Amino acid sequence: MGIPVLVLGRSGSGKSRSIKNLDCGIIKVIEKELPFKNNFKTVTTSDYVKIIQILMGSKKDSIVIDDAGYLLTDEFMRRATEKGYDKFTELANNFYNLIQFITTKLPREKIVYLLMHEDENEITGQVKPKTIGKLLDEKVCVEGMFTIVLRCIEHKFLTNNSGCAKSPEEMFETEEIENDLNVVDKAIRDYYNLGGNENDQQAK
């Protein structure tokens, strides 16, 4: 089974910047430039079928979907004229099925990082992935589908806290680490004794 990792953060917090040192494939849901000089080969699509095909066919052991939240937004906007609540169930189901595909159909050495904006409740301070509102949140708890959720704050990752960040016990030495997905990738592979990206890790 593959491993999905959720990376949350506000715009400008360093989510996309964390990709810089990682040898990976990148799927852009919307076309925007990365915030650093790079030679990454990227594919831009919000089509779930194409994304699944790319995940299956990619030779990279680590793949980033940036920004995964726009999968929901894009489908919602394309279907904005549809009436009724069924479309929210379908939106939730499509996103849920993508995560299920990663965890059940991809090889174990594949790690897929889904970058999303965060939404913080002004009253409770609770942080969750930014979706398209309560009608979708009632259908699926996005963060509940992930064992590893990293929160990006001021160009650092929170790995465990009382909020949304979580990771398996002793995967990371501290609750706060640098926002470098190459470091995260190595920690995950070491923790689960995974193959993949070994030569790239040694070269960096």
Can you say where each PLM-predicted feature lies in the sequence?
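Structured loop/turn residues at beta-strand edges in well-structured enzyme cores
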Residues: 58, 108, 144
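Short, well-ordered beta-strand core segments
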Residues: 25-26, 112, 149-151
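Conserved nucleotide-binding/hydrolysis micro-motifs of P-loop NTPases
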Residues: 31-34, 68-70, 118-122, 155-156, ...
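Conserved P-loop
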Residues: 1-58, 62-65, 69-70, 74
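Conserved GTP-binding G-domain of TRAFAC-class P-loop NTPases and closely related GTPase folds
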Residues: 122-204
